[in-house]
């Protein structure tokens, strides 16, 4: 069944899609996966900055390359994570495996892959990703609309 007004799970994605479309970048399945990737990457970078002794060999020049994993995150990347999840039956573990693949593409990161998700639970990732998505949706969508409404009201 194709997603349209009549087959959507709720009127939010159906009837009101035109009004809520901007929120998809923050609350869709794609967005949640992207935020999970972002949290995992930033956590790994933070471990490197501590510095964790086992990660001393990572130069800070690689941090931008790591951040580009989520900055340039695509639907193909999200689909790859969903494909991994279909095998693992675990959404956050699939993100971890995806990041290990990305580390492989970078080269020279083999010794550090096991520090992706080090000391974390899935809930650590989820309980950071979801509030981050809410924060950014408020800043990028909701607050500007409220400011626009206030400006319009001031004209009366």
Show which residues each predicted segment covers.
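A helix-coil-helix interface module used to build multimeric assemblies
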Residues: 2-156
């Amino acid at each position: 069944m194709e997603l349209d007004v009549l087959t959507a799970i709720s009127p939010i994605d159906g009837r009101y899609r035109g009004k809520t479309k901007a929120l998809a970048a923050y609350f869709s399945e794609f967005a949640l996966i992207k935020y999970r990737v972002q949290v995992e990457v930033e956590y790994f970078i933070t471990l490197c900055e501590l510095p964790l002794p086992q990660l001393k060999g990572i130069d800070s020049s690689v941090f931008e390359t790591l951040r580009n994993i989520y900055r340039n995150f695509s639907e193909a990347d999200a689909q790859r994570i969903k494909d991994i999840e279909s095998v693992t039956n675990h959404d956050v573990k699939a993100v971890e495996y995806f990041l290990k693949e990305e580390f492989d593409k970078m080269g020279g990161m083999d010794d550090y892959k096991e520090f992706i998700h080090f000391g974390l639970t899935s809930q650590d990732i989820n309980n950071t990703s979801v509030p981050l998505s809410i924060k950014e949706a408020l800043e990028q969508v909701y607050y500007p609309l409220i400011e626009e409404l206030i400006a319009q009201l001031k004209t009366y």
